[in-house]
Amino acid sequence: MTNKPLEKSIENVLRQAVEDEGGLCLKWVCPGHKGVPDRMLLFPGGIIAFVELKRPGAKVKAGGLQNWWRQRLAEFGFPCHEVNDKYQAQQLAADLSAESFRRQTEEEEAMKAWHFIGDHSEGPDDEESDD
C-alpha cells in the first residue's frame, strides 16, 4: 500500500481551500465532451479558473484531450491550472482569492469615483432660468 495521496484527496483539499477563501469549486461534467478539466473555480469579481487534477507526479499528456482543452480555454481567456499536490491546491485557492479581492477593491473605488464625478447637486439643469 502506498502513502501517496490520491487525486481524490487533492480534490478534497482544493474544494475545502476554495470554499474557505469564499469561492465555489464546482465539479465540471460536460456530457459529450471528454477531457474537460475536473473543476471550475468561481470567485467574486468575475474570477473563473479551471483545474485539471492529477495524482502526485502525474502530468497532462502533451497530445491528449486534456491538453487540447487547456489550450482551447486559454484561447478564450480562461486560465486552466494543473494541480498535483495539496500545497498547489491551497496556493491556487489563496492566489485566486487575492485576485478576487483586488478586483472587487478596484471596482468599489471606480464606483466611488463615478458617484463623485456624477454627483452634481447644483448643475446646469438645476439653475433657474429667467424666462
Residue locations for each model-derived region?
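Catalytic phosphate/metal-binding cores of nucleic-acid and nucleotide-processing enzymes, i.e., regions
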Residues: M1-D131
